[in-house]
Structures are given as structure tokens and as C-alpha cells.
Amino acid sequence: MEKETKEKIEKTVIEILSESDMKEITEFKVRKLASEKLAIDLSEKSHKAFVRSVVEKFLDEERAREYENSQVNKEEEDGDKDCGKGNKEFDDDGDLIICRLSDKRRVTIQEFKGKSLVSIREYYKKDGKELPTSKGISLTDEQWSTFKKNMPAIENAVKKMESRV
């Protein structure tokens, strides 16, 4: 499939999805409407796969937007929590502290072997210094993006788990 054709299909599919009721529209309906608008048969296997990828990308972006909006609303409701403060705070190693989750846990951005990592870790005090423990996780940019993209699914799973208890 030519680049120009792909761009036309992608633009049309996104336009259709943007104007549609997401509770009613299906991938088949999107493909059918795009076929009619573009006068191209999109029932071919490669076209179906491409339309599916555009739909999935659109839905992922929508979920991410909804999640971000819900987080912004939560932050506004929560008021003065440590996360999201305008003041930048750094630890003893010079790592940026994004958020203190509790007295012993925090989220930081740190450099390790030339890579930036998002670190969610537990800390302990020794000789007046706060030092990281091995309890925690450090994520690369790519891993963080994947984690963030899947946050709505993780939240839903946690809600289901909590409702069973």
C-alpha cells in the first residue's frame, strides 16, 4: 500500500472515529464508511489490518486522554498533595524527586549508565541521609510509556480486585 493511500485512509478513519458514538461504532462500520468516502475497497486483508491498527491507536490515545483528564481532576480535587507540586526537590544524589508517596517511598527521575529512569522506590535513613533500598522498580522511558498507556487497564483490574474483597 502506498504512503499516500495510507495517509488518506488514516485521516478518514480518524475523522470517522472522532465524529462517531464510540458505544455504537464497530471496526467493520468504520471500515465500511471509510470505503464509501474514499471509494476504495478496504475489505482486503492488508487494508483490514491497517484500519485495525489506526482504530487501536485512536482508542489508546483516547484512553490516555481520559486517564490524564481524570488525573488532572483528581489533582485539582486533592489540592495540596506532594505529587505535582511546582517546587522542584532533589535528593542527596541530585535526582529529581517527582513525588513522595509516603515517608519512606518516593518517585524520582534518576540517571543510570547514561539513561534516564523513573524510579519508584523505598528509602531508609542512615546517618541523616535517605538512601534507596532494593525494594522498588526503575523503568526506562519506553517501559514507563507502556506502563502509563496501560494504566486504565491496571486501574480496572485493581477495582475488580478490591470489589471482591
Curated annotation (Swiss-Prot):
Family from the record: Belongs to the transcriptional coactivator PC4 family.
Protein's organism: Arabidopsis thaliana
Protein name listed in UniProt: RNA polymerase II transcriptional coactivator KELP
Compartments it resides in: Nucleus
Source organism, top-level taxon: Eukaryota
Keyword rRNA processing part of the UniProt annotation: no
PROSITE patterns reported in the protein's UniProt record: DEK_C
Domain annotation DEK-C: ranges: 3-60
Any Gene Ontology CC annotation: nucleus
Any Pfam family: PC4
InterPro entries cross-referenced by the UniProt entry: DEK_C, KELP, PC4_C, ssDNA-bd_transcriptional_reg, Sub1/Tcp4-like
Function: General coactivator that functions cooperatively with TAFs and mediates functional interactions between upstream activators and the general transcriptional machinery. Binds single-stranded DNA.
Example of a GO biological process term: positive regulation of transcription initiation by RNA polymerase II
GO MF annotations in UniProt: DNA binding; transcription coactivator activity
Keywords, in A-Z order: Activator, DNA-binding, Nucleus, Transcription, Transcription regulation
Start and end residues of each stretch annotated as Disordered: 66-93
Gene name linked to the record: KELP
Cross-referenced Gene3D superfamilies: Homeodomain-like (1.10.10.60), Transcriptional Coactivator Pc4, Chain A (2.30.31.10)
Chief location category: nucleus
